Design a protein with these regions (language model features):
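Conserved alpha-helical substructure of the radical SAM core
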Residues: 1-124, 138, 142, 146-150
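Conserved phosphate-donor/acceptor-positioning beta-strand/loop module used by diverse small-molecule
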Residues: 127-129
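Alpha-helix-loop-beta-strand connector modules within alpha/beta enzyme cores
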Residues: 152-157
Length: 159
């Protein structure tokens, strides 16, 4: 409970703990989509990549040693492009990180991946959508709104 209080209350009073209570770790700094409003669409290729598991483990080990409450495995890129994403989630949970989450465009959310994510211990997944139907299809190219909705429904169904 104390970790949750620090995580939610400290920032409101412009206070900080001696170590962050939440980390955002970019599992992937690249994306398979070309959304017009997104930074990754315009980033140079030499700064796009995937976080290596050995570096991730060092970050999580230090975070766990300092009682970090939560880790989000995304920032600008699509974390599901990282083939180690499931292992990353499991490792953080094994190290007693209480909340592990990520943001995705859901384009790589296959039925198999949905099951793996549920079994990994991931606490929540946030899915980006910018409108519906044709608007979504235009902004989230090459994604298709109905296909994305079907993937989300499947994940909800098996949850």
């Amino acid at each position: 409970i104390l970790d949750r209080i620090k995580f939610q209350i400290y920032p409101k009073f412009l206070m900080s703990a001696s170590f962050p209570t939440h980390l955002e770790v970019e599992a992937a700094s690249k994306c398979q989509m070309k959304c017009p409003m997104c930074w990754t669409t315009y980033m140079k290729e030499n700064v796009k990549g995937l976080m290596k598991m050995d570096l991730y483990k060092k970050i999580v080990d230090e975070a766990a040693a300092n009682n970090v409450f939560s880790i989000k495995l995304s920032w600008r890129g699509e974390p599901m492009l990282n083939p180690n994403l499931i292992e990353m989630i499991k490792y953080a949970k094994k190290k007693k990180i209480k909340h592990v989450a990520f943001l995705t465009n859901a384009e790589l959310l296959t039925k198999k991946k949905s099951h793996e994510l549920l079994e990994s211990g991931c606490d929540y997944i946030s899915i980006s959508a910018d409108g519906v139907d044709e608007i979504y299809d235009k902004i989230r190219f090459p994604a298709k709104f109905e296909e994305t909705v079907a993937r989300i429904k499947y994940l909800k169904q098996i949850r």
